[in-house]
């Protein structure tokens, strides 16, 4: 026997060279339990996906509902507020109809009536503001068709073109929305209005 080079075998004869055996991975025959496990894993993944989608949908629904409730609180009185604005306009017209000399007259009954109408108008505007309805008077502003309604053009060269020269009726906003646009006269003469920065 020789050393462990593998040149000779136990009988002393030269050993035949042996090629190394490459083993292939063992493939188990199809096991019904593995198929069932794969099916269960697939069902679990689908259930997780459905659960995540349902949770996301519920969160979106919660946010949308909260936004709709907020909008309903803010804008729900729009129809009522429009009707009340007509009353406010009539009170203002009544005050505007009183001549200046009649206001200065010493008649205490007339003064009390004028003060009563003024207090009523102020109280009405305070109630509207309490509910988010705000009056705006755009005199001197650049004309914006989103919040102004042009009724006519004013030929005044001292006012830049496209500027609100006269306000016929004030506008009202509720939250960020226009409840009623301001009725205005827009300047058509003079220098161009500077673009807002």
From Swiss-Prot:
Localisation: Cytoplasm
Amino acid composition bias (Basic and acidic residues), ranges on this chain: 1-12
GO molecular function, one term: adenyl-nucleotide exchange factor activity
Top-level taxonomic group: Bacteria
A Gene Ontology biological process term: protein folding
Residue span of region Disordered: 1-35
GO cellular component: cytoplasm
Keyword annotations: Chaperone, Cytoplasm, Stress response
Family: Belongs to the GrpE family.
NCBIfam families in the cross-refs: PRK14141.1
Assembly, per entry: Homodimer.
PANTHER family referenced in this protein's UniProt entry, alphabetically: GRPE PROTEIN, GRPE PROTEIN HOMOLOG, MITOCHONDRIAL
Function: Participates actively in the response to hyperosmotic and heat shock by preventing the aggregation of stress-denatured proteins, in association with DnaK and GrpE. It is the nucleotide exchange factor for DnaK and may function as a thermosensor. Unfolded proteins bind initially to DnaJ; upon interaction with the DnaJ-bound protein, DnaK hydrolyzes its bound ATP, resulting in the formation of a stable complex. GrpE releases ADP from DnaK; ATP binding to DnaK triggers the release of the substrate protein, thus completing the reaction cycle.
Name the UniProt record assigns to this protein: Protein GrpE
Species in which this protein is naturally found: Nitrobacter winogradskyi (strain ATCC 25391 / DSM 10237 / CIP 104748 / NCIMB 11846 / Nb-255)
Gene that specifies this protein: grpE
